A protein has these predicted regions:
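Short amphipathic alpha-helical interface segments
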Residues: 278-317
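Short, amphipathic alpha-helical interaction segments positioned at domain boundaries
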Residues: 334-370
Length: 370
């Protein structure tokens, strides 16, 4: 602040950076195959220390966001913070990286602690591809999380990643029908190939993953002198491995074009439910799947509850079948996954998973090891 001046800090700096932990608690369990985090051993500050620091920052800089520098926020962070601080108004608006939450109430807790910008580890909506990545989440959980976060007014920034050893065309082909249906959901910031990083399992376990002919990026030849051991200095590598997406350039180009359209037309898309009284609800629908033509649906409360609640396909009703016909939900991992957004209070009232015992969905960590 002293270097740039108080005026610059007051007018131009919107966010402060804060560290509450180091390492990655998920990597301690099952490191994602593309993750290049070098340090190991997750450790974190005590919650009372974090709370004390946040209170100080809020008091000293009341108009600033606080962005956590943590690679991943501590497991159960929001609930623990709420338990320690009933009055969430004392907290500044927060930003953080985190693992996808399975349940709606967990996203509601994020909203309650003033989380405004989050970077969730989405990466894909294909559970098979997520298992290849060792992500510890599923396609249905990722999509459900994005729908819930957007309904709660939380901005998400995420990426979709392609190009993994052994991947198949069908692990990407589904995006051709999914993207037009979710054009109202905030799009990914990146649609990019997985990179081979030195400290990632894709490098450290290259042989076991079927990756051969590892070589450092040629740009290192322009950075270091000839005598330098560039293979030891480099962090970025290339390698050969079987991958159907690399063998399907026409599909990749089509998906890239769809993602661009998603980004360009997201703001004109909507799929939103609101109450109009007397147990009736109006759905406004303008998405890519309908050519951005506005459609309206009037539904009664029982149907609205079914539409808004994730449900195993074996337990689905005629209401779910109707919702699928209208593309108000999709089927992922043999689950009906709702796509319709709503204001947070209405969502919490209609989504029955918010009032029932939390849904016991199988985790990718479980299915990976089965």
């Amino acid at each position: 602040m002293a270097i740039l001046g108080e005026d610059f800090f007051r007018e131009q700096v919107r966010a402060l950076w804060y560290e509450s932990n180091r390492g990655c608690w998920w990597a301690d369990k099952s490191k994602c195959t593309f993750c290049g985090i070098a340090e190991g051993g997750f450790r974190h500050k005590p919650m009372d220390r974090v709370l004390e620091d946040l209170r100080w920052l809020q008091g000293r800089f009341p108009d600033k966001y606080v962005f956590f520098t943590d690679l991943i926020i501590n497991e159960g962070f929001a609930g623990k913070l709420l338990a320690a601080l009933p009055d969430t108004e004392a907290l500044p608006p927060l930003g953080m990286q985190l693992k996808v939450f399975r349940e709606l109430h967990e996203v509601a807790e994020l909203r309650a602690i003033q989380a405004r910008v989050i970077l969730p580890g989405i990466e894909s909506f294909s559970t098979r591809l997520l298992k290849r990545m060792r992500k510890g989440t599923t396609g249905k959980q990722n999509l459900y999380f994005l729908r819930n976060a957007q309904s709660m007014g939380i901005q998400t920034q995420y990426a979709l990643i392609w190009g993994f050893p052994g991947d198949t065309r069908e692990e990407y082909d589904y995006l051709r029908w999914l993207i037009p249906k979710i054009s109202h959901i905030r799009p990914p910031r990146e649609f990019e190939a997985a990179q081979l990083l030195r400290d990632a399992p894709m490098y450290q376990e290259a042989g076991a993953l079927g990756i051969t002919n590892l070589a450092y990026w040629k740009v290192y030849d322009m950075v270091y002198p000839e005598w330098a051991d560039k293979a030891s200095l480099a962090n970025y590598f290339v390698g050969d491995f079987p991958s159907e997406i690399y063998q399907a350039p026409e599909l990749l180009q089509e998906l890239e074009a769809l993602v661009v359209q998603w980004r360009n037309h997201h703001r004109q898309s909507c799929l939103h439910m609101q109450s109009i009284g007397n147990g009736q609800y109006l759905i406004e629908d303008r998405r890519m799947v309908h050519g951005y033509e506005m459609r309206h649906h009037l539904v009664q409360e029982p149907r609205a509850q079914h539409i808004m609640t994730p449900t195993r396909m074996a337990a689905c009703t005629e209401d779910h079948a109707w919702a699928l016909e209208q593309a108000l939900g999709v089927v992922l991992d043999d689950w009906y996954v709702p796509l319709v957004l709503a204001q947070s209070d209405l969502l919490l009232m209609l989504d029955q998973s918010a009032t029932e015992v939390p849904i016991q969905q199988e985790t990718a960590f479980d299915t990976m090891n089965s």
